């Protein structure tokens, strides 16, 4: 992950101008955020382009004394001589701007490329593993309120081998990044990170973390993937108690071994569109989260889901999360609003086995060793583009091939022969809260008893 920055831990009387004066000519890098346009959509008004960019995480940056002669960070954390307390640290230390290209971050139009490695001018290849956040034109993080809404984007994971993790997720971070009198940079310098793993960082919500507490908050993993395996997972929290494991959906782990794969049902050797819907019990943006639904589009057509009835996470299938607020707690966080984080990383300790090895994917236990990745895949990167969010059915035209009725069973091919265990009607039915209609929809239009198909908008009807 990266490592430089510019403004930041400056006392209230030493705002932006003082930071500029503190820089020695030619030794500091200005903070220039790469532009990344996104779109907010409604069924009535279409999609409106947003003034957005990305910002590299605060923890990846260079913190230094005024003349740049000494780092304020040591191998064991913050230098306690320079930073015995927040006010003193703000007087002594500055946070530097970054070169985004050498940090593994590139944008072009609406596309964001995140690279695991960067080759320097000396020929050395370094692991940079960047993490960035979506930043608004006002200098604060964009807060996405996605309860009863959907988020879509295009993604290309074709260059990502076993052991890599391209992640796009939501974190309930403070919109300002914890901006305060001692941290005037805030979100503009990527501060305030938190997630359900409760990482212990040098700063907690923009404030010097003298107590070494974990930075805990609700986390919704929309995408954690390489070309071999993928999972989407809610991680709700109650206070500082979080569901760290989560109750995710991984097609391979559920037995659908040729779904997410190069040449698979969803061909990960080519780009595709991913849509995640946060469906409520009453179809509104103020209801209770009942279902997290995943939809894929490739070549202009909707890809059949891995599981019959759809690739979904429901409260009934997420009982392990109940002590942490459950799916409804995740919905509450989505309703309050969350910040979009995007990253690429690998795992030197566990080789990302939890994602793509054993019962979770086709990779061997050692294939994900970062040294193997560097030797064989130095160009490992992910491309994320065309990020849109808004009303369900408003962000992507799924085309005439729209079909949420589900694909074949894990290790079998579809046949016309009825199974001996079938007890339902011949006509396929949709489950509670599932989609049952909309433009281009060719999946089930009949709901299971006692539910009925209720119109929500031209693109989406729901079993309620």
UniProtKB/Swiss-Prot annotation:
InterPro entries: CBD_sf (IPR035971), Cellulose-bd_dom_fun (IPR000254), ConA-like_dom_sf (IPR013320), Glyco_hydro_7 (IPR001722), Glyco_hydro_7_sf (IPR037019)
Known catalytic reactions: Endohydrolysis of (1->4)-beta-D-glucosidic linkages in cellulose, lichenin and cereal beta-D-glucans
Comp. bias intervals (Low complexity): 409-426
Noted pH dependence of activity: Optimum pH is 5.0.
GO molecular function, one term: cellulase activity
Domain of life of the organism encoding this protein: Eukaryota
Active-site residues from the entry: 219 (nucleophile), 224 (proton donor)
Keyword Disulfide bond included in the entry's annotation: yes
SMART domains xrefs: fCBD
Alphabetical UniProt keywords: Carbohydrate metabolism, Cellulose degradation, Disulfide bond, Glycoprotein, Glycosidase, Hydrolase, Polysaccharide degradation, Secreted, Signal
Pfam family, one: Glyco_hydro_7
Domain CBM1: 428-464
Disulfide-bond pairs as recorded: 41-47, 83-89, 162-363, 194-217, 198-216, 237-242
Function, as annotated: Endoglucanase that is involved in the biological conversion of cellulose to glucose. Hydrolyzes internal beta-1,4-glucosidic bonds. Shows relatively high activity toward barley beta-glucan and carboxymethyl cellulose (CMC), and lower activity toward lichenan, wheat arabinoxylan and other xylans.
Protein name: Endoglucanase 7a
């Amino acid at each position: 992950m990266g490592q430089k920055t510019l403004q930041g831990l400056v006392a209230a009387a030493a705002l932006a101008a003082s930071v500029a004066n503190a820089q020695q000519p030619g030794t500091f890098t200005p903070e220039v955020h790469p532009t990344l346009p996104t779109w907010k959509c409604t069924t009535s008004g279409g999609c409106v382009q947003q003034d957005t960019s990305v910002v590299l995480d605060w923890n990846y940056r260079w913190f230094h004394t005024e003349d740049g002669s000494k780092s304020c960070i040591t191998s064991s954390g913050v230098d306690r001589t320079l930073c015995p307390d927040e006010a003193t640290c703000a007087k002594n230390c500055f946070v530097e701007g970054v070169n985004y290209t050498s940090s593994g971050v590139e944008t072009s139009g609406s596309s964001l490329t995140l690279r695991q490695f960067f080759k320097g001018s000396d020929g050395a290849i370094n692991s940079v593993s960047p993490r960035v956040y979506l930043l608004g034109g006002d200098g604060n993080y964009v807060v996405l309120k996605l309860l009863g809404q959907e988020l879509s984007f295009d993604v290309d994971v074709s260059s990502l081998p076993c052991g890599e993790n391209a992640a796009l997720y939501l974190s309930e971070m403070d919109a300002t990044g914890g901006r305060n009198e001692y941290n005037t940079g805030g979100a503009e310098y990527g501060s305030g990170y938190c997630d359900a793993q409760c990482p212990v960082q040098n700063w907690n919500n923009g404030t010097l973390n003298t107590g070494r507490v974990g930075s805990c908050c609700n986390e919704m993993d929309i995408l954690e993937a390489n070309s071999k395996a993928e999972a989407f997972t809610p991680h709700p929290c109650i206070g500082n108690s979080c569901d760290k494991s989560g109750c995710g959906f991984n097609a391979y782990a559920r037995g659908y071994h040729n779904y997410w794969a190069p040449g698979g049902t969803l061909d990960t050797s080519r780009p595709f569109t991913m849509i995640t819907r946060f469906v409520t019990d009453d179809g509104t943006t103020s209801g209770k989260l009942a279902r997290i639904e995943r939809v894929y589009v490739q070549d202009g057509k909707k890809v059949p889901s891995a599981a019959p009835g759809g690739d979904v996470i429901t409260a009934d299938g997420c009982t392990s999360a109940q002590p942490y607020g459950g799916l409804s707690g995740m919905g509450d966080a989505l309703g309050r609003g969350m910040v979009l984080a995007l990253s690429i990383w690998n795992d030197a300790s566990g080789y990302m086995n939890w994602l793509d090895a054993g019962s979770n994917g086709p990779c061997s236990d050692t294939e994900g060793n970062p040294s193997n990745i560097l030797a064989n895949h130095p160009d490992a990167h992910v491309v994320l583009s065309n990020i849109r969010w808004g009303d369900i059915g408003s962000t992507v035209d799924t085309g005439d091939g729209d079909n949420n009725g589900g694909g074949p069973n894990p290790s079998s091919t579809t046949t016309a022969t009825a199974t001996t265990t079938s007890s339902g009607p011949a006509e396929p039915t949709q489950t509670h809260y599932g989609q049952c209609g909309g433009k281009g929809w060719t999946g089930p239009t009949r709901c299971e008893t006692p539910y009925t198909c209720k119109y929500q908008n031209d693109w989406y009807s729901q079993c309620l």
